[in-house]
């Protein structure tokens, strides 16, 4: 979850609502980690099963705005959390909630997207959810495309409800299809 200055106010509040919606759709057998980032990435909820949704939502709604945007470091910290518990029996995915305006650390769409592709080759998929008026479409779409995930944009959390549901349906159907093989 991007908590940088460019996400301050409404975009960050919408990102938190979006994250809470994701949690509401998860089951107790699912795993979740939450990473926030501005100029630094912080794992605010280490990877764990989704057993106490109320406690997870408390963590989500305690997120406050910060400084500049090291999107690369935030995404990478999220991917590392996924990798720690990667399993061939599960779908391993990073969901990035951001306006995509990287202005600190690695900012090259080409470099970041290439790394998304490398992780996809290792079975960790990246999907991006853009929020806010100044959404960096090029970076977010490129990350999702090379990361073999989906890319969506919305001004509000409500705008992203259908895409989130679509993503969850895709995950459930993909997992069920893989079980049949």
Regions found by a protein language model. Name each.
Residues 1-180:
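Exposed acidic/Ser/Thr-rich ligand/metal-binding surfaces
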């Amino acid at each position: 979850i991007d908590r940088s200055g460019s996400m301050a106010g409404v975009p960050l509040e919408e990102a938190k609502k979006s994250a809470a919606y994701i949690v509401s759709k998860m089951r107790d057998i699912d795993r979740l980690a939450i990473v926030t980032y501005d100029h630094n990435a912080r794992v605010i909820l280490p990877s764990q099963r989704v057993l106490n949704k109320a406690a997870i939502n408390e963590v989500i709604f305690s997120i406050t705005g910060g400084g500049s945007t090291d999107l690369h470091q935030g995404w990478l910290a999220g991917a590392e959390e996924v990798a720690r518990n990667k399993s061939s029996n599960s779908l391993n995915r990073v969901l990035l909630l951001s306006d995509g305006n990287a202005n600190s650390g690695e900012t090259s769409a080409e470099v970041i997207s290439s790394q998304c592709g490398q992780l996809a080759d290792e079975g960790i998929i990246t999907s991006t959810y853009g929020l806010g008026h100044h959404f960096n479409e090029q970076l977010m779409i490129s990350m999702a495309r090379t990361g073999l995930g989906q890319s969506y944009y919305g001004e509000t959390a409500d705008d992203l409800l259908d895409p989130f549901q679509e993503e969850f349906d895709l995950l459930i159907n993909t997992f069920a299809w893989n079980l049949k093989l």
